[in-house]
């Protein structure tokens, strides 16, 4: 599939709109926007996003994810199609949500490895967010795509960057090594710049697909969540990203502004971001966000 076809499928297949903007009738004070741009590398777009609302078992869910593929887009595409379904199929999703997410991450990775002849030798990072009834946000991630929360204009990182240097002992305990070549970032076995990922069959014995997971209450101080691939975080800090978009009323415009700023700062990677926006009651009459 050509890069342009992939981008088109991303836009029309996930939010039900080609504008990159979504709104739920149930949560009239919550909206989301997203945007993405292909990097300067000579390969098709490898970032995939999910940004949608759905009702499951009588609960209203917001599902948000960034999948940043490497060495091909097939694993990221597979995750876009299957990971949330696998999470929601876990029998204990409503009683032990974190355990359900962890099990789904690991079992999904097992399927990806089994299908490596079809899906290729590459892999993908993932950061996922499940918003439950507008009250609780559960974040999980492997790799270096991030989720950042803004409360009263202050950035707080909800995900964990799984850098090889931080997990060197675990990698070495599995028989791998972390390279530290001057002028380059640390890499697992001299190849991969993240210590946790989906796929990557040739490196998997030295990698993990076990996610870091945390939950956050959504309260009146919560303004928005920012999900973005590392093409953003290579060129700006969490607070710089929040400061850039916190005064923008339309979440799609906010996502677009963030990507344009990353490109202007010479980010050359594929970049994707999602901005779920929470309208505080006192601001409903003042702020347009749909």
From Swiss-Prot:
Its EC number is 3.1.3.16. Its cofactor is Mg(2+); Mn(2+). It catalyses: O-phospho-L-seryl-[protein] + H2O = L-seryl-[protein] + phosphate; O-phospho-L-threonyl-[protein] + H2O = L-threonyl-[protein] + phosphate. GO terms for cellular component: mitochondrion. GO terms for molecular function: metal ion binding; protein serine/threonine phosphatase activity. The keyword Manganese applies. PANTHER family: PROTEIN PHOSPHATASE (PTHR47992). The keyword Protein biosynthesis does not apply. Binds 2 magnesium or manganese ions per subunit. Keywords: Hydrolase, Magnesium, Manganese, Metal-binding, Protein phosphatase. Mn(2+) 1 binds at residues 68-69. The gene is PPC3-1.2. Mn(2+) 2 binds at residues 68, 230, 269. May be involved in defense signaling. InterPro entries: PP2C (IPR015655), PPM-type-like_dom_sf (IPR036457), PPM-type_phosphatase-like_dom (IPR001932). SMART domains: PP2Cc. Belongs to the PP2C family. It is an enzyme of class 3 (hydrolase). Residues 31-278 form the PPM-type phosphatase domain. Pfam families: PP2C (PF00481). It comes from the Eukaryota. Induction: By the avirulence factor AvrRpm1 (at protein level). This is Probable protein phosphatase 2C 20.
